[in-house]
Amino acid sequence: MGSRAELHTLLGGLSFLLLLMSGQGAKGGSFKESQGVCSRQTLVVPLRYNESYSQPVYKPYLTLCPGRRVCSTYRTTYRVAWREVRREVQQTHAVCCQGWKKRHPGALTCDEAICAKPCQNGGVCVRPDQCECAPGWGGRHCHVDVDECRTGVTLCSHRCHNTAGSFTCGCPHGLVLGPDGRTCAEGASEPPTSASILSVAVREAGREDRALRREIRELRGRLERLEQWAGQAGAWVRAVLPMPPEELQPEQVAELWGRGDRIESLSDQVLLLEEKLGACSCEDNSLGPGLSRRR
């Protein structure tokens, strides 16, 4: 009797442990599947829309039946018709926990972490306010440059120069940097590397970019002056013309164009006469006979 009671107690304890383990496993799996989701809501959304369907149409007609009798029958045709449809659909809505957000409004997961201050220098926000930095950078927001030359690891055989997010190696006089970019060896200077060529190209591109920006500024200034001149010219033309330019007929435009040519010719003649008169001078500041000086 006692052994049976002990067995019953043991089985009950095992059942409780199995139930507890299964509950923990389900809870852990649910958390892993729904990372960043605090709750889910099922909403009933009413829909109302129009849909097309094939509507039968019965058309009667007369035909000749056996026995030379006239019979009335019908044939069925179909046409496209529209009808209003109303239905309700269930839509699941996920509520994100603090520090998480959805990749798009309709997503059912909240797998994009939020960092109050953006991760810098190629860092990625992997958990709320936690950045995963790119190699060569550290700090909470990946804003601190890691000095590889002071990590205690020998990276260069001679000289190590720290750069932003990386490092470069250098060699003393008489030695050249090897193909690995870290060790130095004796030998003639190697041809320029793609990195040095790229650096020169970048500098040239920078100069060209500055020249292009300067030219763009000059062109913008010219364009502004042309627009101002065009506005003044348009106002002058509208003041001189007997009617708005858009109401002129082709023959009127041709006549005005001819007048403009004649005015330009007369203007050139007047300018020539002014130049000739400016070159004339009288001796002793005296005028010719029959001419009197105005006072």
Curated annotation (Swiss-Prot):
Record carries keyword Cytoplasm: no
Glycan attachment sites: 50
Cystine bridges: 38-97, 65-71, 96-110, 115-125, 119-131, 133-142, 149-160, 156-169, 171-184
Residue ranges occupied by any EMI domain in the UniProt entry: 34-112
Gene3D superfamilies in the record: Laminin
Secretion signal, residue range per the UniProt entry: 1-25
Compartment(s): Secreted
Name this polypeptide is given: Epidermal growth factor-like protein 8
Originating organism: Sus scrofa (Pig)
Encoding gene per record: EGFL8
